């Protein structure tokens, strides 16, 4: 086992604080509408330019093991804020730095670290309650656009695109962000259910020019296993032919004789038909087939449920207004399923999302929920260079999460003002002893940090701005760094999601409390590697007679 180095009390906390400062100083330059960019070196390709706090934090790894521990703890604050609310990572970092800095000073002055932490926790509870009280619910699409614009660092185009996307697919819908090929940022909305399986044979195509199969008002047969012969299906196929409506078969696979028979019937014009593979794999495939069945008002033909192919009747088939199948994907629009059944299925998936601990499962469940509930929107981010596209994509991602959070818990005045005015809620909070009161004071001072930093980044004195705002009793009154004007920020459209503000403060206080109460640190001593010995030049002696 390698030897360890141990640091105690003040020495340990000073090292931690140094690491916290290095990381926080790199992150906080990005805060606010006039925040600057940070350039991140990549081991391959062009450097990455970003204004996203968490991306900067993730890149930082310090040489000194003890300083690195402090930096990694604050990195945790940024990541947690990104996980919970999707934004507010820079605010969380600035708050954590402010609390740690004041806390370390107080501990050095002889206060009890545990009482300081308790005081900090008391203050945070009071502030969170106060912020929640002032939260306003979002009602209009314009307000959604404002949140998106602020979170994308004042980019109105991004705000509008996100608002349109949320209007189209609803709050449950999935919005994904991709890189576009061109210069423009555009929005693609897929209404209805789409899954990534295309037609099994190009002979099913109805529009040869576009190579798509369009089925109007088709019956939909959902089969869990492979179809290799159609003998068992003949009664139901005849019923479909008589109804003169098209048929879509979704099964694990359609092969051999079954596929050949369907193709021949399609070419002869006897039966308008198309076949696609079922989406997903294993248990997820079963669940997705069940989703499609509920959406289209049909039944999954499965031997687990005791339904055999030969017993299938036409009323077991689902229907939809229109189905479009390309080489890669299938879209079902306007399924005939019962609204109550669809809502019940959505509630069930929501419950599963709450219960799961796996990020991958959660993502897949959210996709399923979106396909059932609303649809899928894809924002394609364009730009002149790859570096610009990546930077913009980061901002769009942040903005998307922020708007989601805003719809969930409402909004408060932006620009760090919500936290600044929450200072007043601490007047009535008293700790059990003087040290806890100091903890409350630490939070009181830290709550000014975001406003000050936004002002500093805009080239104005932060202390002057914070002082001027605290003189005003209107809790929405703030400094608009974009225009340099003091005004009512909610009216000016400078708003932050309540969830983002709350998560930033709670995350920052949690980690800062742990850092303040640190009394010893243990890290591995890096082993000095000996320089490589020079190679032996023996054996070269026989070169004497070379006659140079």
UniProtKB/Swiss-Prot annotation:
Lineage: superkingdom: Bacteria
GO terms for biological process, alphabetical: protein refolding
Keyword terms: ATP-binding, Chaperone, Cytoplasm, Isomerase, Nucleotide-binding
Binding, ATP: 30-33, 51, 87-91, 415, 496
PROSITE patterns reported in the protein's UniProt record: CHAPERONINS_CPN60 (PS00296)
Subcellular locations according to the entry: Cytoplasm
Family, similarity comment: Belongs to the chaperonin (HSP60) family.
UniProt-listed NCBIfam families: GroEL, PRK00013.1, PRK12849.1, PRK12850.1, PRK12851.1
Subunit organization: Forms a cylinder of 14 subunits composed of two heptameric rings stacked back-to-back. Interacts with the co-chaperonin GroES.
Full protein name: Chaperonin GroEL 2
Provenance organism: Rhodospirillum rubrum (strain ATCC 11170 / ATH 1.1.1 / DSM 467 / LMG 4362 / NCIMB 8255 / S1)
